[in-house]
Curated annotation (Swiss-Prot):
Family in the record: Belongs to the VMP1 family.
Side Cytoplasmic, residues: 2-60, 125-257, 313-323, 394-416
Keyword terms: Acetylation, Endoplasmic reticulum, ER-Golgi transport, Membrane, Transmembrane, Transmembrane helix, Transport
Name of the protein described by the UniProt record: Vacuole membrane protein KMS1
Top-rank lineage group of the source organism: Eukaryota
Positions where N-acetylglycine occurs in the chain: 2
Membrane topology (Lumenal): 82-101, 279-289, 345-372
GO cellular component terms listed in the entry, alphabetical order: endoplasmic reticulum; endoplasmic reticulum membrane
Membrane topology note: Multi-pass membrane protein
UniProt GO BP: endomembrane system organization; vesicle-mediated transport
Membrane keyword on record: yes
Function: Involved in the early secretory pathway. Required for the correct export of secretory products from the endoplasmic reticulum (ER) and involved in the maintenance of ER integrity.
């Protein structure tokens, strides 16, 4: 009995020591500390996933493979064979590229549990702002040559570099000076905003499916484990309060339903990744989760963001803000006498921007400025892409290492 107890105690100590060793190995596995080992595990995980996917498709996806092959062959023939259909095929391809581009940007924005690319700030937001400013400047919204005439990969919209005279005289001018109303601008950028929102909803599915699979197998997904084991003392002020809110959401998981998921998806917040994990962990039906996420992100949230940017860039809101600011300053002692001169200068600057023709510098100067701006912008995008790639590679390698460690731990426990 005594020897058995000693053996059991030494076995527990060995398992505990191995578990601590495994945790340290996972923590230290990053591209900065162990680049070769991290890349090796990432490649192993990728190959394993591809093999598993191919095996599954060969075993269960006979009809899927057949239909996909037929569609690819038909599409290839339509694209390569010349004929009267060529123009229509090219138009369809433009719409496909346009749709895939904005959906992919949405997926990239939301995938990776908060570590994704901020594509709204990089692409959709600037696109809406530039279109609004151009429409306000030209006094009309018929700027696009087609719905897909937007910012895309290696492509600038045709309307961006055109002067207002090329579109014709302004069509929307009112006595108040608000040239283009919100209701006219919104439909022009609405489709790409909704497509981006659909992409963000699709990007929330992997955490749900991973958590759902973990729940069915009886285990807990990484995000839930980290939340359970996280301490509020080792974080900053914001992280501490965010963890408290997450814990509150975790303890009130019985309230998760269509409406609560819809509310969480509709408002920009850092809690939705956790909500997706919890919905999978606690068995919320897929369609209930996905439809609430889709409506919240693709309809409500994107419209809130789009309308906000249009209002900020629209002349109407600027006029309202100017009037409110003047009213506030008029009540400040000493500033009331300065207001007429300040207002006149503001109006002169605004009229100069809106009504004066844009200066035409020399061809060389334009090229230099474009090159400089493009270089800075591309540098920012590439830095964010690099950061995104590093996070994905590290997370995949760490997950693969954890699976290996679990097998090692299971072998050790069974051998005892």
């Amino acid at each position: 009995m005594g020897s058995a107890g000693v053996a059991s105690s030494s076995s527990d100590v060995a398992i505990s020591a191995l578990r601590e060793k495994h945790e340290k190995e996972v923590e230290n596995l990053t591209l900065t500390t162990q680049p070769l080992n991290t890349l090796k595990l990432f490649v192993e995980a990728t190959i394993q996933y591809i093999k598993r996917s191919i095996s599954y498709l060969l075993a269960h996806g006979g009809w899927f493979i057949l239909i996909t092959t037929l569609l690819v062959v038909s599409g290839g023939l339509l694209v390569t064979v010349d004929g009267p259909h060529g123009k229509h095929v090219e138009e369809v391809l433009e719409y496909v590229r346009y749709g895939l581009w904005w959906i992919a940007l949405g997926v990239a924005s939301s995938i990776g549990l908060g570590s994704g690319l901020h594509t709204f700030v990089l692409y959709l937001g600037p696109h809406i702002a530039l279109f609004t400013l151009k429409a306000t400047l030209c006094g009309r919204v018929d700027l696009k040559s087609a719905p897909y005439d937007t910012i895309q990969l290696k492509r600038v919209p045709s309307w961006l570099d055109k002067s207002c005279s090329e579109f014709g005289p302004p069509l929307m001018i009112s006595a108040a000076g608000s040239r283009v109303p919100l209701t006219s601008i919104l439909p022009q950028v609405q489709l790409e905003a909704i497509l981006w929102g659909i992409g963000t909803a699709l990007g929330e599915l992997p955490p749900y499916f991973i958590s759902r699979a973990a729940s069915i197998s009886g285990s807990t997904v990484d995000g839930m484990e980290e939340l359970d084991g996280s301490s509020t003392e080792d974080s900053g002020f914001m992280a501490t309060h965010l963890n408290r809110v997450k814990r509150w959401l975790l303890t009130h998981s019985q309230h998760l339903n269509f409406f609560t998921v819809l509310v969480l998806a509709s408002v920009p917040n850092p809690l939705f990744d956790l909500a997706g994990i919890m919905c999978g962990q606690f068995g919320i039906p897929f369609w209930e989760f996905f439809l609430a996420t889709l409506i919240g992100k693709a309809i409500i949230k994107t419209h809130i963001q789009t309308i906000f940017i249009i209002c900020v860039c629209n002349n109407q809101l600027l006029d309202w803000m100017e009037n409110e600011l003047i009213w506030i300053l008029s009540h400040v002692p000493g500033l009331a006498s300065m207001l007429p001169g300040l207002t006149a200068k503001l109006h002169a600057m605004k009229e100069k921007y809106i009504d004066a023709p844009s200066p035409v510098p020399s061809h060389i100067k334009v090229k230099k400025w474009d090159f400089s701006f493009a270089s800075i912008w591309n540098g920012i995008v590439w830095l964010m892409l690099l950061n995104f790639f590093v996070k994905i590679v590290t997370a995949t390698a760490q997950r693969h290492l954890k699976k290996k460690q679990e097998k090692e731990m299971a072998t050790l426990t069974h051998s005892d």
